[in-house]
């Protein structure tokens, strides 16, 4: 069973890939987009309804260069999961962000309130435009196969 929550289509892409490539009726796959370092609220609310299940988490985040960041997100999400459940695996990858994010960064850059890392934020925005990509999907499939 696959449930995902997608705001920009990134997590939907991962969820659709899983629908087409898995044949596992014993695991509940839950996908989310990242909001302030955690899963979006709808995904968290759904996870709280699950009990005595095997769960595979998958998600996307606009910032994607740090596996450590991805691990922090997954660990934060796990805090919302009832202890009767078993998280059997997880996958995170970078996802493209809406144009409004770039516009906000560019406006900030022109202001006197620009953070010191504004150029890195803009660079990350452009890098994220290519994600999730075929390599991300292959990595998701390979991880899922190892977990099962």
What is the meaning of each model-derived region?
Residues 1, 19-30, 35-148:
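FMN-binding flavodoxin-like domain, especially the glycine-rich phosphate-binding loop
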Residues 1-21:
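N-terminal beta1-alpha1 ligand-phosphate binding loop
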